[in-house]
Amino acid sequence: LALLGLRRVEERVRGFLEFLASEYGQPCEQGLRLDLRLTHQDLAGALATTRVTVTRVLGQLREEGWLLLDDRRRLVITPLPRR
């Protein structure tokens, strides 16, 4: 619930993924792999935003190199520092 208090949706998405990585992430060569089945709609519902917004933010995080997809399309959170 504390994540919903963050103003920018980008911060909420990043914070939620960091939480999931800290709780459920499995170490891999690139960072922490999330072996969870989450749709963009699942993330949107958890973060009180829209699926379209989640898709846009995830794309931005991938462009920054903070978020990767592995060969099985699982999310990998890289150890890059936060901005």
Q: Model-found features: residue ranges?
A:
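Phosphate-/nucleic-acid-contacting segments
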Residues: 22-83
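Amphipathic, well-packed alpha-helical segments that form the structural scaffold of globular domains
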Residues: 14-22
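A small-molecule sensor/coupling module
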Residues: 1-14
